[in-house]
UniProtKB/Swiss-Prot annotation:
Keywords: Activator, Cell membrane, Conjugation, DNA-binding, Membrane, Plasmid, Transcription, Transcription regulation
GO MF terms, alphabetically ordered: DNA binding
Entry membrane topology: Peripheral membrane protein
Main subcellular localisation: membrane
Location(s) in or outside the cell: Cell membrane
Source species, domain of life: Bacteria
InterPro entries in UniProt: Sig_transdc_resp-reg_C-effctor, Tscrpt_reg_LuxR_C, WH-like_DNA-bd_sf
Natural source organism: Escherichia coli
Chain's role: This protein is essential for positively regulating the expression of transfer genes that are involved in the conjugal transfer of DNA between bacterial cells.
Protein name in UniProt: Protein TraJ
Amino acid sequence: MTVVDPARFMYERNHFPSLTDKEFETLVLYCQMMNVQMVADYQNRKPDVIIKHLKSCRQKIGVESDFELYFIVINKFVNFERVFPELTSEQINILAAFSFYPKRSTIARRFDIYRCDIYDELIKIRNNLGIEDLESLRMLFFMKITVFL
């Protein structure tokens, strides 16, 4: 797997002024690898140190989960309105949540709306993007954000 050196994200670094350089570096690497052990190996550190940095990042940025942390970061790196011009910002958030969370019930709890409403919104998103099935939405989301990174 190709890893982009966190030093290449100097402009994006300005979006997270409360993070230390080590925390930002860990955050960028974690968002690329999504694995604590791989980040620890890459940085020649113990996994406990990586976990501590990620916990500090979540606290300073004000998020609770790894999904939220990842979404905040890619939202700063990628202009979702440009990537998905056919979707509203709420639909983009639901699509991103659907791409990370395994169940619609989790998304419903996260957005405090009914599970059936999540399904209806996903169908609208699918239709707006011209996709055949819901599972293809996940792949499309990751393919599009990867191209824009």
